[in-house]
Amino acid sequence: MIHYLHFIGEFCFSSAVKVVEWFSENLFLKRSTMALSKRGFVMTSNARFHGEEEELELGLGSVRFTRGLGRKRILISSCVRESLSRSAVEIPVVSESPPVKSSLKRQRSRITIVSSSSSEKSRLECLPQDLLIRVICGVDHEDLKSLKLVSKSIREASLVAKTLHFAYTTPKKTRAFRNSIDLEEVSDSRHQEDDIEPPNAPRHYRWTKAKRKEQLSSVSAALFT
């Protein structure tokens, strides 16, 4: 019985508190008045039990409301609502395009770095050394110095080609004219060419039929004696 009575008492007390709050809110609304001022509509109230009165200015109008432990009641005029809606429409939306662009630039820079690092070796350098040496053997003798400065693999292949190919075959000669006067002199003297011999070129001897017969006769004499 004691527990039952205690439960009934708590229920009655809570219902009484709710009724008092309802009456206080209704009385506050009845006592509140609307006044039109130069700044707009102002809501005033004589009730002081909710807290101190404060005034809120929004655009064309100001609203006075109470702040405390109870609920807040704010009444906004139609003009203020229209001004708020217009300001909300006119507020520019800040787009997040700049950080996106910066991230895209970073990704592109990374891609270019990766592509440049992957394309450091050309197709010529990717060839095996035997084929690379054969390709370099078809180059002029004067271009070997510049090929040594390209890369390590081409430098090694050019050194091998120099020892194997260019030491036994004569490369192409290049015409050298010091100035335009030398060019005219050469053209006048029945196109005599002033050529530069390539360095370390082997000597070529011209064999005639008489020289070959002499060599063969000496060989035959040595055999039959």
Curated annotation (Swiss-Prot):
Pathway connected to this protein: Protein modification; protein ubiquitination
Compartments (UniProt record): Nucleus
Keywords: Nucleus, Ubl conjugation pathway
A GO term from the CC aspect: nucleus
InterPro entries named among the record's database cross-references: F-box-like_dom_sf, F-box_dom, FBS1-like
Domain F-box: 121-169
Example GO biological process: protein ubiquitination
The protein's assembly and partners: Part of a SCF (ASK-cullin-F-box) protein ligase complex. Interacts with SKP1A/ASK1 and SPK1B/ASK2.
PANTHER family: F-BOX PROTEIN SKIP27
Entry domain remark: The F-box is necessary for the interaction with ASK proteins.
Function, as annotated: Component of SCF(ASK-cullin-F-box) E3 ubiquitin ligase complexes, which may mediate the ubiquitination and subsequent proteasomal degradation of target proteins.
Protein name: F-box protein SKIP27
Species for this entry: Arabidopsis thaliana
Gene responsible for this protein: SKIP27
